[in-house]
From Swiss-Prot:
Function, as annotated: Most important serine protease inhibitor in plasma that regulates the blood coagulation cascade. AT-III inhibits thrombin, matriptase-3/TMPRSS7, as well as factors IXa, Xa and XIa. Its inhibitory activity is greatly enhanced in the presence of heparin.
Example GO BP: blood coagulation
GO cellular component terms, semicolon-separated: extracellular region
Keyword field: Blood coagulation, Hemostasis, Heparin-binding, Protease inhibitor, Secreted, Serine protease inhibitor
Oligomeric and partner information: Forms protease inhibiting heterodimer with TMPRSS7.
Tissue specificity field: Plasma.
PTM comment: Phosphorylated by FAM20C in the extracellular medium.
Protein's UniProt keywords contain Thylakoid: no
Source superkingdom: Eukaryota
The gene coding this protein: SERPINC1
Family per record: Belongs to the serpin family.
Protein name per the record: Antithrombin-III
Compartments, as annotated in UniProt: Secreted, Extracellular space
Keyword Cell membrane: no
Length: 25
C-alpha cells in the first residue's frame, strides 16, 4: 500500500497523511 510507504517515508507529513498516524505512530 502506498499509504504505508508515505507514512514511513514522511512521518512529518501527518497532517497531509493522517493514515501515517495509524501505520507509523
Amino acid at each position: 500500500n502506498p499509504v504505508d510507504d508515505i507514512x514511513i517515508a514522511k512521518p512529518r507529513d501527518i497532517p497531509m497523511n493522517p493514515m501515517x498516524i495509524y501505520r507509523s505512530p
